[in-house]
Amino acid sequence: MASFDFVKAYQWNYRPQIPKRPAWFTEWPGGNRIAVTFTIMHEWESKPGWATMRRFPMPPNSYHTDDFLGLGAREYGANFGIWRLLDVVDKHGVKATVISSGLTAELFPDTVREARERGHEVASHHWNQTLQPPSYNTKEEEREAILKSIAAIEKATGERPLGYMSPGPRPSPFTLELCAELGFIWNGDYSDSDIPYTINVNGTKVVSVGYVRPAYTDNDIMELGLSGGLQQLKDEFDAHYEEAQRHPMKFRYSMHNFTGGRPGLAKVFDNFIDYVKGHSGVWFCRCVDMANFWLEHEGR
């Protein structure tokens, strides 16, 4: 069985014990060879936030710490970028996973509500991007933030999210336990495997559906320019597709509403979907679809 024990693998001295490919895993649903998942990061952060730290710190003698350029980017993502990305996947008839901060769902409930109405999955991305789980002192502090995110998404969409990804993604030693306790069936934090796998968290199974960086997010390709970024995505997909002829593979591309949602990178995404659709044996799926497929074979 392609699962492993949470206590052994996820401890302070993290040493992965990722299982080998299970014998039953010979194909994806429909006999497909490669699963392709698109995730849209629908993020928000409170001041001063990561936006400040990513560019440069505010002057130490500044009378305020508001990074209006960085915070404005988040406004752009929620008001324009998310809609552009949803329109791209809808154009191609592909369903995506929107990974939303709870605060985004609270401030812009129409975005996650309509995403769900269009058939896309809405997963939790913690409460906001400013506070990473490792910054919490206790498991209960992290639990409270995740519960706030769940409540905001459920209020906006009418459904409780089934997937979770930490900001960063930088989970804490408590994160997987909280995912299991709070009813999440998948987690997207770990970039340690080419395929999904189940994690046995104190008797509850959580499916890991992470991705391996670099080159799998808009942040990884944006410095290459639009044509260079598209070529990088094609090259990465080609490598996965070639290997998928020997054994099933997964490919996940992730976009942020405030970067990948800009016209240029959104067009790169549009063209990339066209390219992928030109290949046979491709299963376009949401993260929850992949997790459910895995649990159907591994047991819940």
Describe each region flagged by the PLM.
Residues 2-163, 168-207, 230-253, 260-300:
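Catalytic alpha-helical scaffold of carbohydrate-active enzymes acting on polysaccharides/glycoconjugates
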Residues 209-228, 232:
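Positively charged, amphipathic and often flexible ligand-engagement surfaces
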